[in-house]
Amino acid sequence: MATPLLENYARQSVFDALAALFIRPDAAGVLERWADAVKVTAALAGEVGIPTATLDALREKPLPTAESVQAEYETLFGEEGPVSLLESDWPKTCDDPRATCRLEYLKADLAVTDELGVPEDHLGMLCGFMAVLLLRENPDAAERFFDRHPGKWLPALVDAIRNRPEAVFFRDAATLLETICEIEASLREAKNY
């Protein structure tokens, strides 16, 4: 059984890898971090009693090339892509997700810049903020943020990705996102008992 501190560091590493994947999938080291995130997520899933067979199968897959992942990313999520990575484009979220996220980042003393080239409510930014909160050893704030933001629309995003025939690598990423939602829900249930 992992200690809560170790569990939070594991969650932090997964969210950090997902932030990189959904902001710059072609950057050096991103796919290796993805592979590590799959392993860590499988371990976390096992800890909370979630079956790991699907993640174990993902671990066995060879890594694609950065170029193929970038091309698929552009096809799915680019300006003309059919799937949005912005919370503001999904139902069930707050009135102005971008402004709400910006406020949350500022409350956490994080500078908000457009250096990364993505809006504040972009999935990569949300995952990055989760990683920061967990790294700062503030899991309660991370869980509240997850429940208010990505947790509200990730299931719909997962379905949208899976419904796209051109999704190959990101179909696997959707599986990882789905498992993360299950892990987060399981962690909340465990706290309530």
Per-segment meaning from a language model:
Residues 1-193:
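Surface/interface-facing alpha-helical segments and adjacent flexible terminal/loop regions used
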